Amino acid sequence: MSLIQVSNLSFTYDGSFQPVFENVNMQLDTAWRLGFIGRNGRGKTTFLKLLLGELHYQGSIHASVGFSYFPYPVKDSSQLALYVLESICPDFLYWQLLREMNLLGVPEEILYQPYNTLSNGEQTKLQLAVLFLRENQFLLIDEPTNHLDMLGRTLVSRYLRTKSGFILVSHDRAFLDGCIDHILSINKANIEVQKGNYSSWWENKQRQDAFELEENRKLQKEITRLQETAREKAQWSDRVEATKIGQGPCDRGYIGHKAAKMMARSKAIAGRREAAIAEKSKLLKNIERADSLKIFQLPYHQSTLVRLQNVTISYGERTVCRDISFEIRPGDRICLQGPNGSGKSSLLRLILGEAIPHTGEVRIGSGVRLSYVSQSTLGLGGSLRDLARDQGVEESLLLSMLAKLGMAKTQTEKDLESLSDGQKKKVLLAVSICQKTHLHIWDEPLNFMDVISRTQLEELLLTFKPTILFVEHDKMFCEHIANKTVTLG
């Protein structure tokens, strides 16, 4: 058995007073298939960089294996894909690469195409295939699902299940359940390792949270009772002491003795109260705040907001989708599904009014207001105040929404460009949620989003039932939210 030993690990970014990690100790087995979870901004990618030795830290990290990071930085993406893979792992055997590619459903011919002409999903699969051919390496896999469709996620999850020796950062619950045997979670107050998959971790967390909340309630009730009892005893003792004036020596001695006993009892009660307070302070440290969100959608009083009739989208000679017909009515939560390249994002942008080459008919209802969230966070920068003003939402409302999504005030005061991808996605979603609109159009809204925030979004959409058209590859989210599905390809 080979171990990764982390001892007294502490790290703080330059210019920050808040440590990301403080005196962290853990042992990780290099044979584990380890899922790595935690709210956005907690330090998952930072921890991977510490393992890679890219950041200076206090403490020690000892390992008998090397670390390889996904996604691997490609210097010249114009090369043939085969040459790019050779730069990642120079000594792989060709037949071994083909074996791995076959497991991932990737055809051999794409090796002889320029790497930058491949889809993001194809690039993901090729990189994983070749990285697992590197010997004596422990893979650090950082959010591989962001560019994978639902079928691709299923294939990669099954593939990873056949491997061992990796840390996998992902927020896709079904994907994690399909391939991991341990969970590493960054909680509010600590970092912990558990055996099992995501679902078993979540069940344990829910059980622990419920237990701590009930214990907290009992202790608070006991503290209140003890405080009241101590107050009554102290008041009685004071009254009795006052009656000693004018009494005879025997009476005063008796009364004083009784008052002393009562005072001793009062001190004992105070001690029990302090013990209860100390016990209470140990609870609730890892309970995540997941406040309910509210959405501000306007009612629409016509029967149809959007109608597509026999829509075909083509780029030159390449047709990406053909003869698509559907309607969006008030209350519809439509999931647009299909493999990568089937025209889902193009169809959304067509509805938004972009000049997408197409035939067929697209009708938008009179006065329909749309709110759009792109799958990409590129280009987001500047201050939150300026963004709120430009998007026509109240800054205080936006700040409140982001706080409920787990973003600290210090994070919202930064230049948006400096935020993590998950935090940027929360900003974009929060803006959309705050906008007064008739129809929300969200393109892969869960990219980079942590699990707690995903469940908050699910609760929001199921509670307020807004009209929404969305593209998403998170299987659980689609099953929970969609009341209609349109399949392309």
Map each language-model feature to its residues:
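ABC ATP-binding cassette signature C-motif
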Residues: 1-216, 296, 300-489
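Flexible nucleotide-interacting loop at or near the entrance of a catalytic core
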Residues: 2-4, 212-319
